[in-house]
């Protein structure tokens, strides 16, 4: 999906700041995307205090695109999480606080286009304005290049955050991650117990339960050894602990 629509500009309420210079170049590098139609980005960075057109419609679109992309990312990355936990985890990644942090990392505050009153009142630091701008930029990328491209941009931006929750890419095994997480919150360590060992001695499958009384979490893992089964149970427990607590 691409867009080549003309963008009208309100000449009555012009903002003298232009999208160029070092801040702009650094922003594009961090974003990992260069607009073929710079006016799309300008509108995505234009707050309603500057007049019309502004970024509210782009924000509306970007909100839906972001939710879809993050939902897909979490669905693929955490195959054992149930729907409710995926929903809570997604909310942690797309809420205003998370988007504000992302906007700050991208340097959007230096580029946002504001009306005089909003600018004087510190609007370029306001979390809601910056969070909305992130969604608007995502909407603009979607309009210009379609979902496949904007999804790649979103995944690249969120990958460092997702990696922190993913035992497979953290460099530590699941039991260690779970133990460290619980210790940091002064929660009693998990209890592991073998529920069942099936099969011949040379080809057994172990079923292990992991219980965290302090969090009310109970998970089960299986593997060809007790250790592997414990690791699988710990992985599931860690994911649940991160999402719920």
From Swiss-Prot:
Residues 173-243 form the DRBM domain. The keyword Cell inner membrane does not apply. Its cofactor is Mg(2+). Disulfide bonds: none annotated. It is an enzyme of class 3 (hydrolase). SMART domains: DSRM (SM00358), RIBOc (SM00535). The keyword Ligase does not apply. Gene3D superfamilies: 3.30.160.20, Ribonuclease III domain (1.10.1520.10). Its main location: cytoplasm. GO terms for cellular component: cytoplasm. GO terms for biological process: mRNA processing; regulation of gene expression; rRNA processing; tRNA processing. PROSITE patterns: DS_RBD (PS50137), RNASE_3_1 (PS00517), RNASE_3_2 (PS50142). It catalyses: Endonucleolytic cleavage to 5'-phosphomonoester. SUPFAM superfamilies: dsRNA-binding domain-like, RNase III domain-like. Its EC number is 3.1.26.3. Residues 24-146 form the RNase III domain. Mg(2+) binds at residues 59, 132, 135. It is found in: Cytoplasm. The active site is at 63, 135. NCBIfam families: RNaseIII. Belongs to the ribonuclease III family. PANTHER family: RIBONUCLEASE 3, RIBONUCLEASE III. Digests double-stranded RNA. Involved in the processing of primary rRNA transcript to yield the immediate precursors to the large and small rRNAs (23S and 16S). Processes some mRNAs, and tRNAs when they are encoded in the rRNA operon. Processes pre-crRNA and tracrRNA of type II CRISPR loci if present in the organism. HAMAP family: RNase_III. Homodimer. This is Ribonuclease 3. It comes from Nitrosomonas europaea (strain ATCC 19718 / CIP 103999 / KCTC 2705 / NBRC 14298).
């Amino acid at each position: 999906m691409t867009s080549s629509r003309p963008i009208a500009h309100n000449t009555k309420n012009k903002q003298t700041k232009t999208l160029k210079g070092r801040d702009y170049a650094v922003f594009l590098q961090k974003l990992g995307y260069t607009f073929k139609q710079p006016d799309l980005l300008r509108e995505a960075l234009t707050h309603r205090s500057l007049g019309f057109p502004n970024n509210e419609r782009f924000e509306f679109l970007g909100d839906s695109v972001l939710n879809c992309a993050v939902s897909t990312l979490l669905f693929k990355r955490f195959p054992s999480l149930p729907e409710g936990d995926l929903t809570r985890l997604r909310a942690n990644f797309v809420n205003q606080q998370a988007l504000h942090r992302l906007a700050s990392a991208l340097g959007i505050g230096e580029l946002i286009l504001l009306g005089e009153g909003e600018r004087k009142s510190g609007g370029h630091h306001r979390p809601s304005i910056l969070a909305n701008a992130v969604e608007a930029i995502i909407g603009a990328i979607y309009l210009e290049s379609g979902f496949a491209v904007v999804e790649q941009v979103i995944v690249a931006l969120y990958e460092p955050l997702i990696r922190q929750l993913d035992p497979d890419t953290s460099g530590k095994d699941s039991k260690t991650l779970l133990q460290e997480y619980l210790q940091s919150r002064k929660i009693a360590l998990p209890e592991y117990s073998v529920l069942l060992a099936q099969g011949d001695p040379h080809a057994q499958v172990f079923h292990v339960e992991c219980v965290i009384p302090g969090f009310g979490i109970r998970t089960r893992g299986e593997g060809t050894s007790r250790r592997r089964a414990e690791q699988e149970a710990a992985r599931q427990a860690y994911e649940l602990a991160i999402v719920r607590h």
